[in-house]
Amino acid sequence: MTDIKSLNDNFRKSFNGGKVLLTTGINAKRQEEVAEILNQVRCFNNFTKANDPYNEHDFGSFDYNGEKILWKIDYYDKNYRYLSENPSNPEVTNRVMTIMLA
């Protein structure tokens, strides 16, 4: 098994291994802006004890053109119906990252 932090980092950087959801506020932006926001999510590395107390790299926020952008990774079973019983096991877990305006 791999640790949750590594699985989350790999997913966040590649967007492979789960689903990425953009809220209405993000989708309303120009295509170029959405691409820039997605790139900032992929490159995010400002993890601190305050925003990452469990060292899972499952949440981040940054400013983009005067707006705060948040992203959060949640862990679901393979059918996306229930929360995963073991987020460190990719055999039983799908990741869902939601990117939104604060």
Regions found by a protein language model. Give the residues of each.
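Compact soluble domain cores
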Residues: 2-62
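Short, compact, well-ordered microdomains
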Residues: 58-102
